[in-house]
């Protein structure tokens, strides 16, 4: 069951969670590498678009679209950014009404690239020139039933490692743009700020503002650098612009999921050993097996008996500078604020080793 932030407010476009995230790469080799990555992460390639080089990967309630189109907006995006996250989609109650409202609030509608007989899904210009699709359920048929041919004998969980749904999706923006993008989501869909962090490492720092939709199912933290050399600025330089930094996917058993992912060849960011020396003090009474946390490099945060805890881990960068987060919530609806500094410092130490700062 989806854990959601408890938000009670006007929902002008009827948001109801993430529908999909779309990825691309500039050439066939890059597309094949993404296909292999999604297989390693437990997704099954269940369908192919009827007329385009577009493929659907699924696992429980997570939909990933892999777009290998050699022309058009997506290809231009890939040529600029390399392997990248070129779009995301919100589930909404009525897509056309949602698009009209968003446009009335200053969003820029992007022209459709649908062919005859295909769904014309409204899209807005999003972060870094990516697209933000607005998708409703079109009665009894999903968007995939209309535009995709499903592969016989395959189902979403054939290769599942236990990932269940998209928990949040984080943006990295240029300095001075955090207010711009938080304001964008506030205007078009009545998002509200639920967390704000100011993280300082040894040499660099960042600000982060977490925005949540009225439905409580769409959470978008927005990161902005405090200086020229932080990991946020490095991302923007490598990615050639702003964009989606990471995608957080939930699991009901992070220990089992991470073991399966490791067995499949997925690499994770390391955690300093000193982190685990402080866990029992920082999260007293957490009740988790400390040696397994250490073995798997899992991070823990929260307040047992109060708001609960969460467990999380981050992959290495796997799509250009983009990475994935695996998260299990045990009552806690935060973003691992207590881990931000530890994680920030570990990435910063890697930057120092590589001579970036």
Curated annotation (Swiss-Prot):
Gene3D superfamilies registered for this protein in UniProt: 2,3-Dihydroxybiphenyl 1,2-Dioxygenase, domain 1
PROSITE patterns the record matches: VOC (PS51819)
EC number(s) per entry: 1.13.11.27
Pathways involved: Amino-acid degradation; L-phenylalanine degradation; acetoacetate and fumarate from L-phenylalanine: step 3/6
Membrane-spanning parts: none
GO MF: 4-hydroxyphenylpyruvate dioxygenase activity; metal ion binding
Keyword Oxidoreductase: yes
InterPro entries: 4OHPhenylPyrv_dOase (IPR005956), 4OHPhenylPyrv_dOase_C (IPR041735), 4OHPhenylPyrv_dOase_N (IPR041736), Glyas_Bleomycin-R_OHBP_Dase (IPR029068), Glyas_Fos-R_dOase_dom (IPR004360), VOC (IPR037523)
Keywords, comma-separated and alphabetical: Dioxygenase, Iron, Metal-binding, Oxidoreductase, Phenylalanine catabolism, Repeat, Tyrosine catabolism
Domain (VOC) ranges: 17-137, 165-316
Binding site residues for Fe cation: 168, 246, 325
Top-rank taxon: Bacteria
Recorded catalytic activity of this chain's protein: 3-(4-hydroxyphenyl)pyruvate + O2 = homogentisate + CO2
Co-factor binding details: Binds 1 Fe cation per subunit.
Cofactor(s) needed by this chain: Fe cation
Record's keyword annotation contains Thylakoid: no
GO BP annotations, alphabetical order: L-phenylalanine catabolic process; tyrosine catabolic process
Protein family per UniProt: Belongs to the 4HPPD family.
Subunit annotation: Homotetramer.
Protein name: 4-hydroxyphenylpyruvate dioxygenase
């Amino acid at each position: 069951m989806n854990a959601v932030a408890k938000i009670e407010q006007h929902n002008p476009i009827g948001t109801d969670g993430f529908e999909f995230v779309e990825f691309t790469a500039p050439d066939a080799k890059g597309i094949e590498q993404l296909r292999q990555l999604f297989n390693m992460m437990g997704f099954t390639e269940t369908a192919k678009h009827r007329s385009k080089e577009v493929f659907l990967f699924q696992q429980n309630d997570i939909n990933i679209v892999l777009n290998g189109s050699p022309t058009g907006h997506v290809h231009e995006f890939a040529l600029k950014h390399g392997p990248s996250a070129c779009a995301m989609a919100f589930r909404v109650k009525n897509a056309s009404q949602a698009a009209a409202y968003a446009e009335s609030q200053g969003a820029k509608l992007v022209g459709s690239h649908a062919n005859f007989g295909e769904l014309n899904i409204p899209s807005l210009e999003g972060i870094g020139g990516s697209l933000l699709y607005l998708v409703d359920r079109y009665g009894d048929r999903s968007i995939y039933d209309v535009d995709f041919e499903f592969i016989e004998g395959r189902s979403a969980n054939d290769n599942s490692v236990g990932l269940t749904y998209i928990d949040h999706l984080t943006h990295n923006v240029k300095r001075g743009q955090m207010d711009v993008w938080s304001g964008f989501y506030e205007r078009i869909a009545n998002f509200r700020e639920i967390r704000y962090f100011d993280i300082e490492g040894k040499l660099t720092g960042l600000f982060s503002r977490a925005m949540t939709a009225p439905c409580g199912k769409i959470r978008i933290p927005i990161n902005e650098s405090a200086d020229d050399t932080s990991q946020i600025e490095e991302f923007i330089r490598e990615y050639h612009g702003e964009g989606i930094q990471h995608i957080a996917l939930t699991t009901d058993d992070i220990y089992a999921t991470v073991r399966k992912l490791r067995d499949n060849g997925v690499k994770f960011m390391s955690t300093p050993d000193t982190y685990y020396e402080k866990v029992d003090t920082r999260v007293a009474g957490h009740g988790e097996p400390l040696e397994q946390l250490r073995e798997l490099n899992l991070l823990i945060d929260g307040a047992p008996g109060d708001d609960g805890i969460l467990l999380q881990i981050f992959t290495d960068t796997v799509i250009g500078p983009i990475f994935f987060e695996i998260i299990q919530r045990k009552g806690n609806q935060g973003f691992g604020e207590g881990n931000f500094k530890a994680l920030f410092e570990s990435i910063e130490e890697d930057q120092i080793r590589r001579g970036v700062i």
